[in-house]
Structures are given as C-alpha cells and as structure tokens.
Amino acid sequence: MAFTSWCIPLDKLNKKLPLGEITLFGVLGAITFALQVAMSGLPNIEPVSLLVLVYAVVFGRKCLYPIYVFVVMEILFFGIQMWNINYLYVWALLALAAWFLRDMKHPLAWAVLAAAFGLLFGLLCAPVYLFTGGLGYAVSWWISGIPFDLMHCGGNFVMVLLLFAPLRKLVENLYARMRTGK
C-alpha cells in the first residue's frame, strides 16, 4: 500500500498545490542547485544527497518538485549532457529509498544510506552509458569512476551524519509553520 501511495501521479491527486508550496519548492530546488555549484570545487562532495533525503522524509512525494527544479536548473545552467539523463532518475531513486525508510531515527542509519548511495552512484548511472555506448563502455565508465564514488560515499556519510537530523527538524518545523500560518 505504501508503494502505491508514492506512485500516484501528482496530476491525479486533483489537488492544487498552494502558492506557498510552489514558492517553497522552487526556492528549495534553487538552494539545492546553488549549494551544489558552490561546492563543485570538491570532487563528488555535494549537498544534493543530503537535501534529497530531507525533502523526501519531510515532503513525501512532493519532494519531486524541488528535486526536478534542481535538475532543470542543472540543464539550463550546464546544458544538456549525458549525466542529465542520470539525474532524471537517480535522485528520485534516493528519494524513494528515503521515503520507505522515513521512520529511521538514528543519524548513523541515514549516514549509511547516503554513503551507500554515493558508493553506488556510478553503478546507478551506468545504464545510460550501456544504451549509448554498449556494455564495455558502461562497465569501463563505472570502474573508472569508482575513486569518485568513494569520495561521494565519504562526503555523503560525513555530511548526512552531521546535518541530517538538524536539517530535518528545521525543515519539518518551518514547513509546519508555513502550513498552519503561524
């Protein structure tokens, strides 16, 4: 039942998104993009994984709005690239995993999830290269990226261990205040 409720297309909910949420999700997507660009000098150490986890846990399926605002901003800023195709699904996969595990309380568990995602990032992106260059290209692309996946893993682990719990609490509180008007 839980999987079914996640998969209901947003346009089938027959609910209009309130203006406050439209604004909030646009700003969160832009913040995600700005932070990723600000940290782009660090190889594969980025705040996107952390923020996707927080958005998924706090907003449920509505987390797709800020995620895809971020993806569209990436495309507009950097142009259409092969990795944009990966971004169309990898962040949603992380959000889905976070949503299923949203009741986890221990920060270490969230850090392990983020680290595993960072470690598997290249593997998750490899299918695009399988279709564009064949099996040999996809495997060589994935293997050559393992050092970057290790950095992604470590960066995600530390960032999520330190920041997930306070960010989750902050976003939950601010979102509740926004929805109640207090």
Question: Over which residues does each language-model region extend?
Answer:
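Small-residue-rich segments of transmembrane alpha-helices in multi-pass membrane proteins
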Residues: 29, 56-61, 117-125
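Interfacial aromatic-anchored transmembrane helix boundaries in multi-pass membrane proteins
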Residues: 33-46, 69-101, 133
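Membrane-helix interface segments
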Residues: 18-21, 61-65, 104-109, 137-138
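Hydrophobic transmembrane alpha-helices
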Residues: 1-54
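Helical-face signature of the major facilitator-like transporter fold
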Residues: 25, 29, 71-75, 145
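Generic transmembrane alpha-helix motif of multi-pass integral membrane proteins
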Residues: 48-64, 96-102
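Membrane-embedded alpha-helical hairpins and interfacial helices in multi-pass inner-membrane proteins
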Residues: 82-90, 100-182
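Central hydrophobic cores of alpha-helical transmembrane segments
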Residues: 64-75, 109-119
